[in-house]
Amino acid sequence: SGSRWGLKGTEDLGNVKVGFQLESGFNSDDGASAQGGRLFGRQATVSVSGAYGTVYAGRLGSVSSDMGSVGMLGGVSPFGSSFTDLGTHGSTGSAWARYDNAIAYASPMIAGFYANAMYSFKADSKSVKEVKAAENKPEATRYAAAGLGYKNGALDAVLVFDYTLYGNDTTHLGNGWSVILGGNYDFGVAKAFAKATYFDNQTDAEDVFHFPVDADSHKLFNLKGWGASLGASVPVFGGNFMAEVGYRDSEDVEYHNIDFKRWNTTVGYNYALSKRTSVYATGGWVQEKLDAAAKIKVNRVLVGGGLIHNF
């Protein structure tokens, strides 16, 4: 998990509650702010909640992620975005990110169903290309997403759709979108996870190895393709053993002769020292192949561990 600290508060006004959440990510090695140097880059929102749900405004994680107050993909894998390159986002093509200038809605649960939605008027206020762009104008990249979830006993399932309207000053062929179906089922002796995704013209798909194909940015591949993952979590020796395999197959929609294939395999163990403190260790192998005029294959083995304390 990424290092962070935050402030959170609510006030009950009778029929509604108003609140705020400020969450700051930082690099524990040198104390520098993460998320592009933002003080509260993980989340910075005000909210109003009542019987019909909660409305958020500010900066927060997308519906098509496991982050923040409206992210819906936390239950599709035992390894979320906090596991960085080993996380399940490596086998998706969704805009798994945080967005500035956003408004979002989270519904109450009704008969096991719930829904989240969001819209960003300007996705990244610190982007060099969009720093002067006016909010909700064609020169600004805008983002919309909606998801439907269902929880009933041991079943937890979600369906999420997102759509990115790229700013006019970018060089993309068209707008991007993705759809993700996933969830988990608790069998008691083990919990099984699964996810499938299809995406088109996405530029925020995880690119760990930064193949030097697009001169504008190491991450701006206009990707089209699909991905899937299977995982499990099993109680072992007082903790949880976790494992997942993920695959993504995609091509660059601008340069059709460029294909990307990626495998993720991850294992981990989490052990609770108390109700608020736990330790974890992870390890995995990631392979990404690029088939173009030059063929590149990169393999990487990653290991890590950490301590989590919830205040």
Which residues does each PLM region occupy?
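Membrane-spanning beta-strands of outer-membrane beta-barrel proteins
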Residues: 2, 39-41, 98, 110, ...
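Structural signature of outer-membrane beta-barrel channels/translocons
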Residues: 8-12, 49-51, 106-109, 149-153, ...
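Outer-membrane beta-barrel domain signature
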Residues: 29-36, 89-96, 127-137, 167-172, ...
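Outer-membrane beta-barrel "beta-signal"
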Residues: 298-311
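Residue-level detector of the transmembrane beta-barrel scaffold of outer-membrane proteins
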Residues: 17-21, 54-56, 114-116, 156-158, ...
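Detector for outer-membrane/organellar transmembrane beta-barrel domains
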Residues: 139-141, 145-266, 271
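Outer-membrane beta-barrel pore domains and translocons
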Residues: 23-25, 60-64, 118-122, 151, ...
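Outer membrane beta-barrel
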Residues: 1-123, 140, 148-156
